[in-house]
Amino acid sequence: LKAMKAMFMVLVLSLIGGYIFSLLHIPIPWMLGPIIVVMLAQFIYKGPLNWSGKLRDLGVVIVGTSIGVRFNIDLFTMLGSILFHMLLLNIILIAGSIGIAYLTSKWTKVPMKASVLGAIPGGLGQIVVFAEEEKVEEIGVISYFQVIRLLLVVVLVPFIVAGHAVGKQIVDAKFSLSLILLIALAWVCSYLMKRIHFPVSYFITPILLLITLQLFTPLTMPHVPGFVMAIAQLLIGAHIGLMLKPHMVKLPIRILIGGVASALALIILTFGSSFIMSFSMGASFATSFLSTAPGGLDQMVLLADAVHADISLVSTFQTFRLLFIFLLVMPLMKLFYRWREKKECIREQEANVENVNV
């Protein structure tokens, strides 16, 4: 009962936040409103606040379903040129992240390993699990760096791209039983993929499922109506709002400032690299920036949807970034640290041998 009350409290706060933000015509109001209101409430309200991870997953499945229905299959014919751009932009991003981490580590006196894990724009959950596996002590600092990046991206980026919205006549879809069945099917498939440790399963599975259904079945897919997308925004926003815990703000001031500075530097870096994409691929500014921005996959796609950017391109680029980090960058980091530990071990043994000889 207590847990239900804590969740109900977050739901009420999220609804208030979403409603206020939509009255103020702020971009993606039903995600930004809950994030800001729930986050601030943690510092004022002393009772328990809680949100189910399953509800957040449902929000992500809805976003994935919405993309899958509208995914531009023609993208596959352009994969060659897109792949080159995705690799180039991700190499710039990772090199930039490591550079930013180096400067942050020098200034905040946080060890380089923790600083890199704080700066790399992967998924927060996966980065923290990786840090625990690697026995990094500064888990709190890494979590703070990752959360502050997510929050700054989700709060600043909408205002950067809002002026670049493309005016499109929106035909709002009808809510139907077939849509409920489709979301349920996507959720079940995502859950099964999660069981076999498929990366970002709740997001990628619905997209793959719907692309497959569109390619191989004569079914017409129901579009996701605006109010269902607003529900998805709220389910995700409430979860993000609870991520910045009051105890995180008790970190040393240098680390607090370092986290904000490193997140802003990443946003500036991706803002710059988005012009490469815009120039060489002829994509709009909103599409390019949302494709490269170091935010959460689901949030960037919701934003792309709000400003009518090319969601197929944004979701492809953002998914590639996460997979690039999970499947290539992290294993390479593991190998690098193993090699360094071995080297240090050998050095220590040699030093010991010398001491014995002396």
Model feature map: region roles:
Residues 21-36, 56-59, 82-93, 113-120, ...:
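Structural signature of hydrophobic alpha-helical transmembrane segments
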Residues 6-15, 71-102, 179, 230-231, ...:
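Entry/N-cap segments of selected transmembrane alpha helices
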Residues 154-159, 280-358:
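C-terminal transmembrane helix pair
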Residues 35-79, 209-216, 226-252:
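Hydrophobic transmembrane alpha-helices of secondary-active transporters
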